[in-house]
Regions:
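NAD(P)+-binding Rossmann beta1-loop-alpha1 motif at the extreme N-terminus of oxidoreductases
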Residues: 1-53, 60-63, 90
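Conserved active-site and cofactor/substrate-binding residues in soluble primary-metabolism enzymes
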Residues: 15, 35, 63, 79-82, ...
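A short helix-to-beta-strand connector/capping loop
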Residues: 51-60, 127-129, 171-173, 298
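Rossmann-like NAD(P)(H) cofactor-binding subdomain of soluble oxidoreductases
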Residues: 55, 61-70, 74-148, 164
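Internal alpha-helical scaffold of NAD(P)-dependent oxidoreductase catalytic cores
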Residues: 83, 94, 119, 123-126, ...
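NAD(P)-dependent Rossmann-like dehydrogenase/reductase catalytic/cofactor-binding core
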Residues: 198-202, 227-237, 243-342
Length: 342
């Protein structure tokens, strides 16, 4: 069977390890430190990031990157987005064009404004067609416990997407394929910004109407910037767009929503990040998306106000008023783009 290396032992990396190992694949889980390795081995689970989900005994855990990648035919990258470049740079000597690489990290690199597959490509010393992205409405807490969900594998080559679909598909984890790598990545990254917004609405004690409006107009923003960058508009109506947006904006599993709640209650960004103990991807992604909007001349008013709350300490109440009092406009807009297909 395909030998798999999972790089990153956060909640999502742990959940994917459980999923793939339970299916019978030999999986090596790479962790950053010996202390993390010892803690997981002692407890039989990742108590810090995914408590209550036992790792199958067959999983091999290592803090040695060369050992993790030795013999691997599929490499799953599941580190926080700001750490992807560093880990690929370190892993590059042990990678080759025959290995499949799947990015399961959701975010945009702030300095370069690159998507995760672009970052990976930039650090590989070779060209590869065996690169894909996995994204969808997939909270680790539920996937690790075998609760039914669906996801998307996007790749530039249909054969690559089909092969990976077969590997990841289980009776509780249904995988769809998509040729739109840009759209799938952008949907997975940008929904975290809108989840911060719905959390802020909760923290301000607003109602369901407010959150529905934020999600709907947030999806319009995501679609607007995504299509300018080459994505297919319909992708954002699918699992990696609307599906991921809904679950991230409504679930208390969502770190971004929980962080938004604290912001709405008056805490500053530094207080929120210090108190989570986990990475809140939406905070960095807001900064990147704000820069992308300016770069491409795309209107993203929700993103702009969340940026000002995070980085300029704007009062959330004032931000909401400014959103509501914007100039009048039409709801729908024409989006012209090429059709993405294999």
């Amino acid at each position: 069977m395909t030998q798999i290396a999972v790089l990153g032992a956060g909640s999502w990396g742990t959940a994917l390890t459980v999923l793939l190992s339970t299916k019978g694949y030999p999986v090596k889980l790479w962790v950053r430190s010996q202390a993390t390795l010892d803690a997981i081995q002692a407890a039989g689970q990742n108590e810090r990031y995914l408590p209550g989900v036992m790792l199958p005994p067959a999983v091999k855990i290592t803090s040695n990157l060369e050992e993790a990648l030795s013999g691997a035919e599929l490499v799953v990258v599941v580190t926080p987005s700001h750490g992807v470049r560093e880990i690929i740079k370190r892993a590059a000597p042990y990678l080759d064009e025959d290995k499949y690489i799947v990015s399961a990290s959701k975010g945009i690199e702030v300095d370069s404004l690159l998507r995760m597959t672009e970052v990976i490509t930039a650090e590989l010393p070779f060209q590869t067609e065996r690169l894909a992205v996995l994204s969808g409405p997939n909270h680790a807490e539920e996937v690790g416990r075998g609760m039914p969900t669906t996801t998307v594998i996007a790749a530039g080559k249909k054969a690559v997407a089909d092969h990976l679909q077969d590997i990841f598909m289980t009776p509780t984890f249904r995988v769809y394929t998509n040729p739109d790598v840009v759209g799938v990545e952008m949907g997975g990254a940008l929904k975290n910004i809108i989840a911060l917004g719905t959390g802020i609405a909760d923290g301000l004690n607003f109602g369901d109407n407010s959150k529905a409006a934020l999600m709907t107009r947030g999806l319009a923003e995501i679609t607007r910037i995504g299509t300018v960058m080459g994505a297919r508009p319909l992708t954002f109506a699918g699992l990696s767009g609307l599906g991921d947006l809904v679950v991230t904006c409504t679930s208390m599993h969502s770190r971004n929503r929980r962080a938004g709640i604290e912001l709405g209650r008056g805490k500053k960004m530094a207080e929120v990040t210090a108190g989570t103990g986990m990475v809140v991807e939406g905070i960095r992604t807001t900064r990147a998306a704000y820069a992308l909007a300016r770069k491409y001349g795309v209107e993203m008013p929700i993103t702009e106000q969340i940026y000002k709350i995070l980085y300029e300490e704007k009062n959330p109440h004032v931000a909401v008023v400014d959103l509501m009092l914007r100039g009048k406009t039409h709801e729908t807009e024409e989006i012209v783009t090429g059709f993405v297909d294999w």
